[in-house]
Amino acid sequence: KAFVFIENDADFLLHRLPEEVKTAHYHDDETHIRTLLELGGLQPKGGMALAAATVRGLILTVSHQEQIGVLYPQVLETLVRGACRELFA
């Protein structure tokens, strides 16, 4: 249920923050993912934008665990392995 809040209300809350706070502390997903990949010495084949969008897609599956059912852990692992194979193999 917490991820439903995040999906629906994060944008609203972000707009309420003062601009200087956002400038100092908020970065888009791609910035954080780029930093993590660079620290690991990884360069995704499809580029950073694709890697960031893929990670966002994987994160969004968390809010659909109930619909996916008891196989969610295996489904997520399959998706992650496939994404890694496509981006880095």
Where are these regions (language model features)?
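Secondary-structure edge/capping motif, primarily at the C-terminal ends of alpha-helices
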Residues: 6-13, 62-66
